[in-house]
Amino acid sequence: MTTRVTGNERRGRQLLLRFSGFLSAALTVMALITATRALAPVVAYIAPQRVRSHFMRRAFASGNCRSRRFSVLRSTVGTETRNENNITTPYHSPLPTSRYVYQSSRTLSSRNPALPLESTLMHSNANELTDVELKNLVAHWRDHPVLNPMVTFRSWVVPIKGKMIQAILNSKSLQPYLASRHELLQEMHVRLKIVRDYTDSTDGTEKLILLHPDTPPLSELPADVQQLLRNCQIHENGPVMPTKFTYKDFTASYILSQLLPIAVHPPPTAFETIGHVAHLNLKERHWPYRFLIGQVLLETLPLIESVINKVGEVSGPYRTYDFGLLAGRNDTRVKLTESGVQLQFDLADVYWCSRLSEERQRLLRTFQPGQIIADPFCGVGALCLLAASLPQRNCTIWANDWNPKAVEYLRENARRNHVSDRIERLQCGDAYDFLMDMGLQQHQKASTRSRKEDVTNKDGNHVTPTEPMRLPDHVVMNYPVEAPKFLGALRWWPVPPSSRRGSTTRDGGIGSVIVPRVHVYTFARADPTTDRDAEEVAVDLVAANLLPLGNTIHCRTEMNEDYDCDIQVHPVRDVAPGKVVLCGDFR
């Protein structure tokens, strides 16, 4: 017999099933929340920054943060950082923004109502700060108490006798007690004067030496130190010396380490100085604080008037890059001096790298007075002007660049440094054509000389004029991205019949030529698949582009044996992990 289910019973069963599903989902969510709170410390160590920030906030809010590191962070919020003498001391914990910055921001908020009471510096993820919070932080960081501390130094009264004061300062036993050992002073770019005049001295024969705030009175010092002080005729403690410091006394790296959240540590400290411009390449985690970083650098570096940050990669036919202004005036027309040579150009128009200064000096040491230097990638002409301007070099310059503005800056800088007569050739065009044309011109000169009549020398013998073909003495190809590809243009240059090395001029009758020394720059990485280091990779790259027929081993063997052309590799700089710029020199 079949039981008939009524409509009400059917609807009741459906409601019961739905309620069971909702109850199961709620229990699952509660279990996930409990697991999230319990696993917060573990996730905080291993998760990416965005996930880590979420779990840390949940842990702080719930109180279930069991990790020792984060428990210390919670317990230190709002605590005082003063010693027994009520002397404010800097906080040097691995968590530099945990308690000191928090309590300081509360004091700062009372004076600046626009600043939120909860310190914006406590946020682990800067991307979650509002625009108002970031603007307030940039506006009020100079008033932060952590950057304007008052330190009260103790002192000793020292008699002025001979070299007594210098002996105390140099004593290894007494140096730990001097004010110069204070941790805060290690973060300053100004030197504190620890020897002061003693105004209470009756006869003016005594001075004060400032001591570390934690230095105990004379009677509490170790016996050997007391005896040493008696030998130096130090018998009494001097007055305490309250000293006020401001943010202007500290280095930019210290200021940023105190202001930036832990999540974006370490703070950016490396930048390139180009005239009045500080050029940064900020990481993604520093991007939300870019204006704060720019203001700090502008305030702490006296010669800097503009702070810019590179946006994107170096690209385009002229190897330029976009940048954004972080602080200061919007002016990228810079003036700088290198080894007495004045350079002026606009960073927005040309490529410039101050880190190549040492490499330019190395090249200059290889130049001889009166030589001809060819630079197919001259840029604004720093190397060209140095070679032409320095009295001990006085070289003749053949220069070329693809960027018309770079060529114009070189022409103006040559006129500014009074070496325009040394710039014999200056053109704007393709570097391959520039190199190839020099070789073709020498072939034409050789053909012209071969048609001339023989002349008689002083011995009465008929000879053909053998004036060397005038190729440059040095060719500098500083364009690491593609310079080796232009080596094929050298195949248009005359090759001397003799391959013996040891002289820049190789004789061979009509074909006598001056053999240039080529300096070609390239990027290189080690190749573990072929067991070659970066230098071997660079040598093979140069050989393969100079003699493209055959494999690289064949090319290298042909250059070494047939042409007696040994490539010497010099490291220039690191540009990325495992990636370097190398300079290959050969004749």
Swiss-Prot record:
Keywords of the record: Cytoplasm, Methyltransferase, Mitochondrion, Nucleus, S-adenosyl-L-methionine, Transferase, tRNA processing
Biological processes per GO annotation: tRNA N1-guanine methylation
A cellular component annotation (GO) from this entry: mitochondrial matrix
Disulphide linkage map: none
Bias (Basic and acidic residues) ranges: 450-461
Entry EC no(s): 2.1.1.228
GO molecular function: tRNA (guanine(37)-N1)-methyltransferase activity
Gene3D superfamilies associated with the record: Met-10+ protein-like domains, Vaccinia Virus protein VP39
Subcellular location field: Mitochondrion matrix; Nucleus; Cytoplasm
Principal subcellular localisation of the protein: mitochondrion
InterPro entries xref list: MeTrfase_TRM5/TYW2, SAM-dependent_MTases_sf, TRM5-TYW2-like_MTfase, TRM5/TYW2-like_N, tRNA_Gua_MeTrfase_euk
Root EC class: transferase
Record: residues binding S-adenosyl-L-methionine: R360, D430, A431, N478
Annotated segments matching region Disordered: 446-469
Similarity-based family: Belongs to the class I-like SAM-binding methyltransferase superfamily. TRM5/TYW2 family.
UniProt subunit comment: Monomer.
PANTHER family reported in the protein's UniProt record: TRNA (GUANINE(37)-N1)-METHYLTRANSFERASE 2 (PTHR23245:SF43), TRNA METHYLTRANSFERASE (PTHR23245)
Function: Specifically methylates the N1 position of guanosine-37 in various cytoplasmic and mitochondrial tRNAs. Methylation is not dependent on the nature of the nucleoside 5' of the target nucleoside. This is the first step in the biosynthesis of wybutosine (yW), a modified base adjacent to the anticodon of tRNAs and required for accurate decoding.
UniProt protein name: tRNA (guanine(37)-N(1))-methyltransferase 2
Annotated source species: Phaeodactylum tricornutum (strain CCAP 1055/1)
